[in-house]
Amino acid sequence: MNEQTRISLERAAELKSKIDDYIQARKTINRGLEKEEEINKRKQKILSILNGTEEDWNNYKWQLSNRITDVDTLSKIITLTKKEKEYIKEVGTQFRWAISPYYLSLIDPEDICDPIKLLSIPTHIELEDEQEDLDPMGEEYTNPAGCITRRYPDRLIINVTNECAMYCRHCQRRRNIGQQDSHKSKAIIQESIDYIRENEEIRDVLVTGGDALTLKDDYLEWILSQLKEIPHVDYVRLGTRTLVTMPQRITDEFCNMLKKYHPVYINTHFNHPMEITKESKEACEKLANAGVPLGNQAVLLNGINNDKFVMRCLNQELLKIRVKPYYIFQSKHVKGTKHFNTSVDDGLEIMEYLRGYTSGMAIPTYIVNAPKGGGKTPLLPQYLVSKGTDYVMLRTWEGKVIKMEDEPAVDIKKLIKEQAQD
């Protein structure tokens, strides 16, 4: 064996040892694709209680109209203590809750701290939060017309509805949810589109809510067709969690409609590997096959995914279903959600771990939204240790400090011109 091979093998063994802890931890992380049998059993129980059929289950309109919104029905499906039942009713008077039959089937009924349960079912902690701010992003002050939110020079949001298939307990717009579903009228949306048409610097439009995909196909198509007619709008993004909470929404008809209005992007919101199931995988693949790029915007949530192994597993599983991890958001300080908050140090520790320990494709950007509409602020661990006049000291993903030459760029155009002279 030559020296190069010996060193290479030693290095390979060293690298292999660095992944042992994740391989062991991964075995303990619940993943939806590996829980198909248990999910199906719960599905059958839910169908029996709701008097539904397999055909009903696969129909998103049935899923939406049969969201579970009362404690009595919920307690027939998952185990709830007497106190939990009382708390859910009490919280529901202030902060609405509803959960699609599909998403409910993902909950382990016996696990009081099941991550899917924490994401979707109210807890009394929501009422113990003394924070007063329901709009920490200051969105009410960034609404120049219609149902627009504008915080950046060349892009904006159209909030088309307050409806969702499931109301996340950490929702940043819970102030808009109320107790009744309400899509924005054509007049309000038209006002928003007219504003975009009149402001030629707008090139990127995000259609969201609520959940944009709770709108029917024809209403969504009208919005997309209007935006497509505006020359300076380069592309449209749709914000939706239905891929996670109601994947039946992604029909062949819907995908064929989107094809007419490319480039269309979809940003979705997986927070835990348990949410990646056979059904959500099929929904993502349908969209990807229809030419729709998919990006995931996770939120760092205490007790759900503020763990380096869980986040690594989530991002790697997302790539397998053709969803690019795009952002990890620091949770926002919205009233009733304080128990989900983690420290920025937690986020930086996760980002530090991901770098080098998984491929760049599986590493999203860690984002903190500055309060009062300050916008997205990306955060990274510090890899630049120091800087001299002609060098930098870098910290590698393994923590090694290495010196690298760093000189100013030459004037390449001047150099080429000088060399070309006779």
Swiss-Prot record:
Question: Where is the Radical SAM core domain positioned along the sequence?
Answer: 150-371
Top-rank taxon, per record: Bacteria
UniProt signal peptide: none
Keywords (alphabetical) are: 4Fe-4S, Iron, Iron-sulfur, Isomerase, Metal-binding, Pyridoxal phosphate, S-adenosyl-L-methionine
Its EC number is 5.4.3.9
Q: Keyword Kinase, does the record have it?
A: no
User: Where do the annotations place [4Fe-4S] cluster binding?
Assistant: 164, 168, 171
Cofactor or coenzyme needed: pyridoxal 5'-phosphate; [4Fe-4S] cluster
- Database matches in PROSITE patterns: RADICAL_SAM
GO MF annotation terms: 4 iron, 4 sulfur cluster binding; intramolecular aminotransferase activity; iron-sulfur cluster binding; metal ion binding; pyridoxal phosphate binding
Catalytic reactions on record:
L-glutamate = 3-aminopentanedioate
Q: Which family does it belong to?
A: Belongs to the radical SAM superfamily.
In terms of NCBIfam families, this protein maps to: Glu_2_3_NH3_mut (TIGR04368), KamA family radical SAM protein (TIGR00238)
Write the protein's name: Glutamate 2,3-aminomutase
Organism field: Clostridioides difficile (strain 630)
